[in-house]
Amino acid sequence: MTASILEGFSIEVMPRTLAKIDNLEALLPPSTRVYLAHIEGVDFQDMLAAAARLTKAGYQVMPHFPARLMKDVSTLENWIQSYAGEAGISEALLLAGSPRAPQGTLSNSMQLLETGLFDKYH
């Protein structure tokens, strides 16, 4: 028997796309890994609400943590605390992000790790 790739897949969505879908459960099986894309111009509160909705629906949610969109380390800490406390998130995809120039003091994924905050809240 040949396994189908569609027996196991992940998907990436943005909050504005998710907001247009009333019955996500009809499209995605429970426990699907959903990467939540955080691009320039997306408000963190929209990200948080989308993450909470997805978690509540039983998906494995992994929000993006784009370093170049963060103002500073305290912003990173707020995101970690908010995602964990308000949306039940326990995983994250760390990346530099799409803006060429950082919008704050962080510019790459290694700097996010070097803060020690992911270990602190593990």
What residues fall within each predicted segment?
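Active-site beta->alpha loop and helix N-cap motifs at the rims of alpha/beta catalytic domains
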Residues: 1-122
